[in-house]
Amino acid sequence: MSTITSYFGFLLAALTITSAIFIGLNKIRLI
């Protein structure tokens, strides 16, 4: 159970970082 929770947390963090970088790149392109 602990492994699944840690894996889900890691996946959520990776998704958040990826989306943040993607949004940042889009803002740079608009400027």
From Swiss-Prot:
Quote the SUPFAM superfamilies the UniProt record gives. Answer: PetL subunit of the cytochrome b6f complex
Q: How does it sit in the membrane?
A: Single-pass membrane protein
* Segments passing through the bilayer: 4-24
Q: Which GO terms describe its biological process?
A: photosynthesis
Q: Which GO terms describe its cellular component?
A: chloroplast thylakoid membrane; cytochrome b6f complex
Q: List the disulfide bonds.
A: none
- Keywords on record: Chloroplast, Electron transport, Membrane, Photosynthesis, Plastid, Thylakoid, Transmembrane, Transmembrane helix, Transport
Give one Pfam family, short name only: PetL
- InterPro entries associated with the record: Cyt_b6/f_cplx_su6 (IPR007802)
Tell me which domain of life the UniProt entry assigns to the organism this sequence originates from.
Answer: Eukaryota
Q: Where's it found, cell-wise?
A: Plastid, Chloroplast thylakoid membrane
Keyword Acyltransferase among record annotations: no
| GO molecular function (one) | electron transporter, transferring electrons within cytochrome b6/f complex of photosystem II activity
Q: Which family does it belong to?
A: Belongs to the PetL family.
Q: What job does the chain carry out?
A: Component of the cytochrome b6-f complex, which mediates electron transfer between photosystem II (PSII) and photosystem I (PSI), cyclic electron flow around PSI, and state transitions. PetL is important for photoautotrophic growth as well as for electron transfer efficiency and stability of the cytochrome b6-f complex.
Note the subunit structure.
The 4 large subunits of the cytochrome b6-f complex are cytochrome b6, subunit IV (17 kDa polypeptide, PetD), cytochrome f and the Rieske protein, while the 4 small subunits are PetG, PetL, PetM and PetN. The complex functions as a dimer.
- Write the protein's name: Cytochrome b6-f complex subunit 6
- Organism for this UniProt entry: Morus indica (Mulberry)
